[in-house]
């Protein structure tokens, strides 16, 4: 099954997440089909906290991809 989920990046104690479209059998930070945005949970000041390519997310959801719980919350907040 294709899922839209977060892949962790950044460094120790400074998480940064990419919103990725991937096969659910792949590891969290492993192979992916497409990156459709990012989430920076510790953004400060003018730094961008969330960016989502809504057009591509809607395309993948239309193709039957499932969003993870956290990604679904982020997509709702991005509207």
UniProtKB/Swiss-Prot annotation:
Pfam entry (one): Ribosomal_S16
Keywords carried by this UniProt record: Ribonucleoprotein, Ribosomal protein
Molecular function GO labels: structural constituent of ribosome
Entry-linked SUPFAM superfamilies: Ribosomal protein S16
InterPro entries with a match to the protein in the record: Ribosomal_bS16, Ribosomal_bS16_dom_sf
GO biological process per UniProt: translation
Coiled-coil regions listed: none
Any single GO CC term annotated in Swiss-Prot or TrEMBL for this entry: small ribosomal subunit
Family: Belongs to the bacterial ribosomal protein bS16 family.
Name of the molecule in the record: Small ribosomal subunit protein bS16
